[in-house]
């Protein structure tokens, strides 16, 4: 499917918005979904082995935990809405997730030796991810970065298996 023109560059037409949304959803959004969830499962799996089931309290900065507690309260006040999950890792932004990885890189490096490269990749991904998630139109370079990191992320879970770590969904 050829990329449609960014609808924001033309006179408003709802059909252009629909075309853009379908294209971006099919082209990239699902890859972000997979990529972020693989990273969350990877971090949870490794830190569960290294620090135990309650790794969240031991391995995550207090400010991040406070932000998560605030978000949990917001969700609990609207129980009819979708819930991100029970574990705090589902409530953190990509930037906070990257901070958790950075602080715990000494544990993660045992399984993913190139974790420092991943820290840079995740930081590079934040703006393209937010552009797409906030319903804006990413440039081709950003879409290509999402594609590249999605492909690279496929190699992360086999690293768990190689180290005899079962993937643990938070």
Predicted features, each with a name:
Residues 1-170:
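Amphipathic alpha-helical interface elements
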């Amino acid at each position: 499917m050829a990329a449609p023109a960014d609808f924001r560059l033309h006179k408003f037409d709802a059909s252009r918005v629909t075309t853009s949304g379908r294209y971006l959803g099919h082209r990239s959004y699902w890859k972000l979904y997979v990529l972020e969830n693989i990273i969350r499962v990877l971090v949870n799996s490794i830190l569960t082995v290294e620090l135990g089931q309650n790794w969240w309290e031991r391995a995550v900065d207090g400010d991040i935990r406070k932000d998560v507690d605030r978000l949990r309260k917001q969700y609990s006040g609207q129980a009819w809405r979708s819930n991100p999950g029970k574990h705090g890792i589902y409530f953190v932004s990509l930037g906070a997730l990257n901070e958790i990885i950075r602080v715990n890189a000494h544990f993660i490096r045992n399984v993913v030796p190139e974790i420092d490269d991943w820290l840079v990749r995740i930081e590079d991904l934040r703006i393209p991810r937010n552009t797409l998630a906030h319903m804006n139109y990413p440039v081709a370079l950003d879409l290509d970065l999402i594609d590249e990191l999605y492909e690279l992320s496929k190699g992360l879970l086999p690293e768990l298996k190689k180290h005899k770590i079962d993937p643990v969904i938070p």
